[in-house]
Amino acid sequence: GQGSLAYPGLRTQGNLETLGGPNDATRGLTSLADTFEHVIEELLDEQQVIQPSKENKDADLYSSRVMLSSQVPLEPPLLFLLEEYKNYLDAANMSMRVRRHSDPARRGELSVCDSTSEWVTAAEKKTAVDMSGATVTVLEKVPVPKGQLKQXFYETKCSSKGYAKEGCRGIDKRYWNSQCRTTQSYVRALT
């Protein structure tokens, strides 16, 4: 399709034949970059269906922060990466002048508070609070036909170092007090 890839400023076009010269074995195969772009576009289209509507309030609880896996994932959730890619595509549709002024790298843009994100297993997070305020036990392992899957949560917390104790960035400390705090959110999980 039209558009850019996940790597800003890089757009690979054509197929393996045009990229690597004529070769009967690769004739007609699309490039890996074009295939990747197509898969991302399909996932973004599917994500649009999941977006909450006024009629479906349960969709508000949809979250990519919970995963069932045989081991703790090493990378952030796919939907976070898709959101970053979608934001890049949205920025690519702006005019060059607007994009130049909104590009974080050009303005030295920083987060208001430093944070760290990591996967935490249910073995480390044994209890949680449900939407009615009751404390519930989090299911650590889920039995499946070929063994067990562990339940893992992707948590983002305020960083213990940096500006958390000194207040938030961009706040005039002469007139305002500020504090970075980790907030709680609800996700769908097995309890």
UniProtKB/Swiss-Prot annotation:
The keyword S-adenosyl-L-methionine does not apply. Keywords: Cleavage on pair of basic residues, Disulfide bond, Glycoprotein, Growth factor, Secreted. The keyword Secreted applies. GO terms for cellular component: axon; dendrite; extracellular space; synaptic vesicle. Its main location: secreted. Glycans are attached at N93. Signal peptide: none annotated. One of its GO terms (biological process) is cell surface receptor protein tyrosine kinase signaling pathway. GO terms for molecular function: growth factor activity; nerve growth factor receptor binding. Belongs to the NGF-beta family. Promotes the survival of neuronal populations that are all located either in the central nervous system or directly connected to it. This is Neurotrophic factor BDNF precursor form.
